[in-house]
Amino acid sequence: MSHSNNHSLRWAWYALAAVIVVLDQLSKYWVQMSFFEFERINLLPILDFTLVYNKGAAWSFLSEAGGWQRWLFTAISSAVSIVLVVWIHRLVAVQKLLLIALTLILAGAIGNLIDRVLLGKVVDFVLFYYDGHYFPAFNVADSAITVGAIFMLADVFWGPSEADLKADVNEQVKNKPEGDSNVR
């Protein structure tokens, strides 16, 4: 793959992350405009849409901590997002499962980061339950993070071999434009 193709593909991953962030934010906006807090609409026997706010992290961790957690989770999400952008930039093209994983996790982190910065809490609205047992409400960003984690695990088992990675890097070095020190 040529250097310019690899560069274009890298931006495609960032564009995909941006699309997921937009979908996440639009869905949260729709829920906030359509529901009162805690209002529920049944979609399926095991699925409702509802509007709940989470001031904490996953499963409402630290949600009652008094407000400081907003800044802690904002800092963590910001740092993770920066690391993921750099990581995606450094990956080689054959690492598709890992690229998908990191793109989804990046989108989810940014989606929830936007909520924390603008609202001080995260908007959740998808509620699964069965026989009186409820899974914590979640959103599109949370789903992206979860699916990204699954892809990351898949990469561990089915990702490219060391030989494939070396071949891809060698191909990029061979096709690198003169004077370009960036090989990815």
Label each PLM-derived region with a short phrase:
Residues M1-R184:
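Alpha-helical transmembrane bundles and membrane-interface segments of multipass inner-membrane proteins
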